[in-house]
């Protein structure tokens, strides 16, 4: 099952005349093509619709008011993720790899700053979760969480590249599974090059570039905050 924002009325403003529709992926005319990422991994797909017919019962909300539904869901997509704990765990992993690689105090200081930022983000997320449990909505906090979480995640992939150095260069897809985890390569494959910790570094760096684009680019999130909070 997927959802789709479909144009049902073109007479008003662009955000009007949109309907939120659920579509069964087994419906005749639905085609799914893989999107190969710059890392060589298959993580996302492109969906095409060829004369697809969907029953009216699949409309969520009211016809022509789908943008309202979409905005509500986007708040939770942007602000419902718990970036903090995952990013703190990644910092811990990078600390261990950095120690093994013998990096200097500058890298350790940058990792400490990243850990502090992840802890601050986690605290903000916990505050928002408390508000959500009381029946609130993410609101503008969702935009802030999305910006902070994705940009800190990207910063950690950059630090990982620096720590790995030249060991991050070899492309070794046969040593990873679709989830990006390091696995034993099939019989006859080339031997692992470099430390295991460096195998997925480049792929994660490349894939994480999308973080500041999906769910509304970070530039758009800053515009939302500037308009609502600063009146710009």
Predicted regions and their residues:
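A short core secondary-structure module
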Residues: 1-33
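Tryptophan-centric aromatic hotspots in well-structured domains and transmembrane helices
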Residues: 1-3, 20, 47-48, 67-69, ...
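Short Gly/Pro-enriched turn/cap motifs at secondary-structure boundaries
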Residues: 10-12, 36-43, 195-196, 215
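Short glycine/proline-enriched turns and hinge-like loops at secondary-structure junctions
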Residues: 13-17, 61, 217-218
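Glycine-rich beta->alpha junctions and the first turn(s) of the following alpha-helix
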Residues: 24, 29-122, 211, 227
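Glycine-rich phosphate/cofactor-binding loops in nucleotide/flavin-utilizing enzymes
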Residues: 69-76, 81-84, 167-232
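Generic, well-ordered alpha-helical scaffold segments in large soluble proteins
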Residues: 73, 93-97, 127, 131, ...
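C-terminal helix-coil-helix/basic helical segment that borders enzyme active sites and/or dimer interfaces
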Residues: 105-108, 119-186
């Amino acid at each position: 099952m997927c959802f789709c924002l479909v144009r049902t009325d073109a007479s008003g403003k662009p955000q009007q005349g949109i309907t939120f529709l659920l579509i069964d992926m087994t419906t005749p005319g639905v085609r799914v093509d893989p999107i190969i990422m710059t890392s060589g991994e298959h993580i996302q797909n492109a969906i095409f619709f060829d004369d697809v017919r969907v029953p009216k019962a699949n409309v969520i909300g009211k016809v022509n008011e789908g943008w309202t539904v979409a905005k509500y869901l986007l708040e939770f997509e942007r602000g419902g993720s718990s970036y903090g704990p995952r990013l703190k765990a990644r910092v811990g992993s990078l600390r261990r790899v950095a120690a093994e690689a013998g990096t200097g105090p500058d890298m350790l200081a940058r990792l400490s700053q990243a850990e502090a930022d992840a802890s601050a983000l986690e605290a903000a997320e916990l505050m928002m979760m408390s508000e959500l449990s009381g029946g609130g909505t993410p609101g503008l906090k969702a935009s802030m969480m999305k910006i902070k979480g994705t940009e800190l995640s990207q910063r950690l992939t950059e630090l990982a590249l620096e720590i790995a150095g030249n060991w991050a260069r070899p492309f070794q897809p046969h040593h990873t599974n679709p989830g990006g985890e390091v696995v034993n390569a099939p019989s006859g494959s080339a031997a692992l090059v470099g430390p295991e910790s460096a195998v997925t570094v480049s792929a994660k760096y490349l894939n994480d570039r999308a973080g500041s684009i999906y769910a509304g680019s970070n530039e758009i999130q800053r515009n939302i905050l500037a308009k609502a909070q600063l009146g710009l």
